[in-house]
A protein has these predicted regions:
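Active-site glycine/GP-rich loop and adjacent strand/helix microenvironment
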Residues: 1-149
Length: 149
């Protein structure tokens, strides 16, 4: 392992995804961030939630560890009957976006399980809806754009 310390630690690393088929090699988000900070000398490392099926929809993680919706994208959480869940109730993540115009990708029901924690009250200070991704539906097909195996 080679440690590369950047001369200027004001950079920000944004990372996301890539563990679907390589789940046995997966490390926690916290461990990954700490390793990047240690090896590169960066102070800010943020995860994001997004998918190739809805290009342009990127939900950035705040410093409190939550993903935030933007002006251009939103999420809904649905139960097993596809009814809307209440805040702080886990269910399937449905992503909504204004960005896709060349294909019908404005609304995608994912196989990811998530929970909306609140709206306009995240401790990071950012307004809007914020949420967590808890995992995937059991027995869902493990695939994704980042799979290389």
């Amino acid at each position: 392992r080679k440690k590369i310390k950047l001369k200027d630690n004001r950079g920000i690393m944004i990372h996301g995804g890539g563990w679907k088929k390589m789940y046995k090699l997966k490390v926690s988000n916290t461990k990954f961030k700490n390793e990047v900070k240690q090896h590169l000398g960066l102070k800010k490392v943020h995860n994001y939630y997004g998918m190739m099926e809805q290009t342009g929809s990127v939900f950035l993680e705040c410093e409190k560890g939550y993903f935030h919706c933007s002006l251009f994208s939103d999420i809904l959480i649905r139960n097993s009957n596809l009814d809307l869940c209440n805040t702080k109730e886990a269910g399937l993540i449905q992503t909504l976006s204004l960005l896709p115009v060349s294909y019908p990708g404005q609304s995608i029901l994912t196989e990811d399980i998530g929970i909306i924690h609140g709206i306009d009250n995240c401790k990071c200070g950012k307004l809007g809806k914020y949420f967590s991704v808890l995992g995937r539906v059991p027995d869902s097909e493990l695939r994704g754009c980042s799979d290389v195996n």
